[in-house]
């Protein structure tokens, strides 16, 4: 089975995800969201430094969410904009797409996040019968333990 995937951003994490999605035999890149206007209309492969994919970058959220996709790989920066990132993710879930994310670090352990912040996303996932899975280097090994071990 091939999963149809939209990549959401081309930043520090997103660019690596984009390369891997584009080249994975079980994944089909069907859309790419970009923040920068100068990236709109550019082939995803060109942005990722790989062969062309035929998928053009866009900042048109409605058009992306109208695509037939199984999943969105959401890697937009959320450190300074967690409410906006959660709003994006809620909108994605409400469109019927599963989410895999490295953004909004507290979503790694959602029960430790204020219920008022996570409730809209959880409700959208439940209503659309989709999932949201967040993972990454935070919290734990790379940002918490490794610097402590290396400094000692």
Segments predicted by a language model, with ranges:
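Short, hinge-like loop/turn segments at secondary-structure boundaries
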Residues: 46-51, 117-120, 150-152
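Gly/Ser/Thr-rich loops at beta-strand to alpha-helix junctions
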Residues: 11-13, 106-109, 113-114, 137-143
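N-terminal glycine-/serine-/threonine-rich beta1-alpha1-beta2 phosphate-ribose binding loop
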Residues: 1-94
């Amino acid at each position: 089975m091939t999963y149809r995937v939209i990549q959401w951003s081309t930043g520090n994490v997103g660019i690596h995800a984009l390369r891997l999605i584009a080249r994975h035999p079980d994944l089909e890149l069907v859309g790419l969201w970009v923040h920068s206007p100068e990236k709109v209309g550019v082939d995803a492969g060109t942005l990722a430094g790989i062969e062309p994919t035929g998928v053009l970058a866009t900042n048109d959220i409605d058009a992306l969410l109208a695509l037939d996709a199984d999943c969105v790989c959401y890697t937009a920066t959320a450190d300074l904009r967690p409410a906006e990132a959660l709003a994006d993710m809620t909108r994605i879930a409400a469109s019927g797409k599963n989410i895999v994310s490295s953004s909004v670090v507290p979503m790694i352990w959602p029960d430790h996040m204020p219920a008022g912040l996570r409730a809209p996303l959880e409700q959208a996932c439940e209503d659309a019968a989709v999932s949201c899975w967040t993972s990454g280097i935070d919290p734990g090994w790379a940002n918490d333990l490794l610097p402590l071990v290396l400094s000692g």
